[in-house]
């Protein structure tokens, strides 16, 4: 996570730089470094903040909050509910697609379950817990990142 502080985040830098210097965030960072060293954690470190990388703050039209990343290999990609193509859409995403169809009469315009196109169109797909241990739902729900993502989601919705 050392690279997290120095990289660019598509316009989110002012919010990130302020939080990255706080003690609670330093604790989260240290915890995640240990977790990644000792366990299988999803998503891969380099895409933990993928939701912010793909959706600039000025482009956010809607925020969709998920609980935590998918717990199985090859699924978590740093976007709530999204899975990389050609992974089949999980049941939670199929429910979202079904709701879209019922409400709009149209099918979702994504290939498989990869919601990257939505993120690039202004849908902030943010999990309240950004990481998870393989096979263990809610395993990182108490490390403080939930407060961080709630803060980001709240600040974002104030500007919609």
Annotated model-derived regions:
Residues 149-156:
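Conserved small/polar residues in nucleotide/adenosyl-binding loops
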Residues 69-70, 116-117, 131-133:
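Short, catalytically relevant binding-site loops at active-site mouths
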Residues 20, 92, 144-148:
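Soluble or luminal CAZymes and related metallo-dependent hydrolases
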Residues 84, 88-124:
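A contiguous catalytic/ligand-binding core that recognizes phosphate-bearing ligands
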Residues 74-77, 124-136:
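Short, basic/glycine-rich phosphate-binding loops at helix/coil junctions
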Residues 85, 99-100, 130-144:
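Surface-exposed cleft-lining segments at the edges of enzyme active sites
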Residues 1-91, 114:
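Active-site and ligand/interface coordination hotspots across diverse enzymes
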């Amino acid at each position: 996570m050392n690279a997290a502080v120095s990289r660019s985040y598509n316009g989110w830098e002012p919010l990130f730089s302020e939080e990255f210097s706080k003690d609670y965030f330093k604790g989260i960072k240290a915890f995640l470094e240990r977790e990644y060293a000792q366990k299988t954690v999803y998503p891969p470190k380099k895409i933990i903040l993928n939701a912010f990388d793909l959706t600039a703050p000025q482009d956010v039209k809607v925020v969709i909050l998920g609980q935590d990343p998918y717990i199985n290999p090859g699924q978590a990609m740093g976007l709530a509910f999204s899975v990389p193509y050609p992974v089949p859409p999980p049941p939670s995403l199929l429910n979202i697609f079904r709701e879209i169809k019922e409400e709009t009469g149209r099918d979702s315009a994504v290939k498989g379950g990869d919601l990257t196109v939505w993120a690039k169109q202004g849908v902030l797909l943010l999990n309240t817990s950004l990481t998870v241990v393989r096979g263990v739902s809610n395993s990182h729900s108490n490390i403080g990142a939930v407060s961080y993502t709630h803060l980001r989601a709240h600040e974002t919705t104030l500007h919609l």
